[in-house]
Regions:
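Acidic, glycine-rich active-site loops and adjacent beta-strand->loop/helix elements
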Residues: 51, 90-93, 142, 172-177
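Glycine-rich phosphate/diphosphate-binding loop of Rossmann-like nucleotide-binding domains
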Residues: 55, 62-80, 138, 146-184
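N-terminal ligand-binding/catalytic initiation module
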Residues: 1-136
Length: 184
């Protein structure tokens, strides 16, 4: 935990915890959106995985996938100054994963699903988007699709063509391939 407010004096600590912490609690109770004002929620993302589709390694499980999720957190922090908790869930049951992530909603400002195999990843993301009031993003689908589209747009610009006149082939029907096709 990195403090964002002063914590040097007894007064500082009394504001951070008891009795001062009661004020933001009361405000958040009145208006839940104030959680983004008074807490770290707005800059905190959960990177969630069950380790069933780790790039280049396959289904290695939640614990073995932990270094990848921690690494993803480093990228979030380094390039966007977003704080991350990696959450490795030891389950292959999609509904159990969905229930667990939903229960974490009060803590996080967003959910980044990572390295969850298809076709389960489609169902999990779709259901979470229906039931959660924070952004849910499946990196392996949409991150890849966005980067692929950006690369295509840059390539078309470099060769002086119009994208509308190009034939684009999506070679593959995995999570990323389907997301690339859906983006078009």
């Amino acid at each position: 935990v990195i403090t964002t407010k002063p914590c040097a004096t007894s007064r500082d600590l009394a504001l951070a915890y008891t009795p001062g912490v009661a004020e933001p609690c009361i405000e958040i109770k009145k208006n839940p959106d104030d959680a983004y004002k008074y807490t770290a929620k707005g800059n905190l993302v959960a990177v969630v995985s069950n380790g069933t589709a780790v790039l280049g390694l396959g289904d290695i499980g939640a614990l073995a996938g932990k270094p990848v999720m921690e690494g993803k957190g480093v990228l979030f922090k380094r390039f966007a100054d977003i704080d991350v908790f990696d959450i490795e869930l030891d389950t292959k049951d999609s509904d159990e994963l969905i229930r667990t992530v939903k229960l974490l909603e009060p803590t996080f400002g967003g959910i980044n699903l990572e390295d969850i195999k298809g076709p389960e990843c489609f169902y999990i993301e779709e259901e979470l988007k229906k039931i959660m009031n924070i952004p849910v993003f499946h990196d392996d689908q949409h991150g890849t699709a966005i980067i692929s589209a950006a690369g295509m747009l840059n390539a078309v610009e470099i060769v002086g063509k119009q994208i509308e006149k190009c034939k684009i082939v999506v070679n593959g029907a995995g999570d990323a391939g389907i997301a690339c096709a859906n983006l078009a």
